[in-house]
Amino acid sequence: MKRFIPHTLLLAAALLTGGVRATAQMKTAYFMEGSVQRLDLNAALVPQRGYAAIPGMGNVGVEANSNFLSMRNFLYPAPDGDGLVTFLHGSVGNREFLRRMRRNNHLEINVRENLLGFGGYARRYFWSFGLNLRSESSINLPKDLFSLLKRLEPGQYDLKGTDITSDNYLEMAMGFAFPIRILTKEVTIGFRAKGLLGLAHASVHIDGMDIDLNDREWRADLRGSVNANVAGMNFSDLRGRIELQDVMDRLDPSDIDLNRIGSWGLAFDLGAETRFLDDRLKVSLGLNDLGFVCWSKKCGVGGTLSDLSFAYSGYDFDREELSTSTPDEIMLDIAPARNRTRMLKATLNVGGEYNILDERIGFGLLWQTRFASSFTSTELTASANFRPSPWFTASLSHSLLQNRLGVFGFALNVHPSWINFFLGMDYIGLRYGKYSDIATIPIGMKAINLHFGLSVPITKPKADGFKAATRARLHRRR
């Protein structure tokens, strides 16, 4: 058991820092004019050409972000200087470890896949359509949980505030962008309206988990709530006090009832961009995912966890098994079904880029703020953007607030007349360490993402319209 706890946390940290932030948006791509991915960051940042996304491959993004989960917080130099040891090792002091934990420790995992998408220029407008599958999950862990794991000393611990939430929905987005003149400045305005179809929602909230640890046993009393909503499922006959497993057994795809698909939502993206200093300085602002999802009671179930207690007696954390006395099942008191409305996690992007050498090189700064229901996170990303050719762009970035030096981002966009290929990551670590038999892993990163996109250019901008200046510059380069 002593080995299982740290290895589980290290596996999660390794997945976060070695292979998978949390809006499923690629910040390094913000100033890459040829990329289609910029539309997801700011509705006014339209690509240079119209496009048709390869179905299922137009924009695929996987992201994870945390304010605590990094290998640096769970692995420490060994006393003999040979390798690393976990936070449970005796050489790591309680205070040294716990000062790195937050009062509330967040982890977000988000996935976005573009199923269908296209966009093009018509007169002075750029129109776009996208059908996206989105998944947003979050976990909140209180500091007392890590205090319990580290200390394992007699006393009382309060783990209230533990939350697990997952929202999964289908997004249909229709957008357009157009230029307007404000005084002497030309401003590009972008707008996207989104219709949302709720697919699945689950949430677990722990109102109270009081743990009493002494020399003979440790006991836990749990109070909380569970809510779930799955499109097409029927939970209407579940009443009274039942086992939680009975709810799980209802999740059978063969029992989907199309009449019970009723969860829906609306959202909007807004964006603007303008230029100063003879077009050398570009300033933009984007607000994304301003909206909600209403989860229908027709396919929902919820209840409370109460009077749930369990105890471990005769434990020895150096053994693989524990002598336990636990309830045979987790009981759920079903509550009357009702509609539940949840706000989306909105994102504010404010960017500025200064260009030199006829826009072949640009230096950008992006301020991103993420508004979640229980917390707000902020990130500042600096980037150097290179455009040596009209069909090739590369960007190198560094996020200044959430990650340490030695973590950088890189994105590549190849967009000749017949293909548009994008690949990038916001967080690539340069510092690595070796722990036990686990492969070499990055240290110091709290977030990681991977984005990939493939589309086919279908049109070019018209001679008139708000891309005329850009097209003239591209023509001069040719």
What is each model feature region?
Residues 1-27, 352:
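Bacterial Sec-dependent N-terminal signal peptides
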Residues 25-478:
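Subset of outer-membrane beta-barrel
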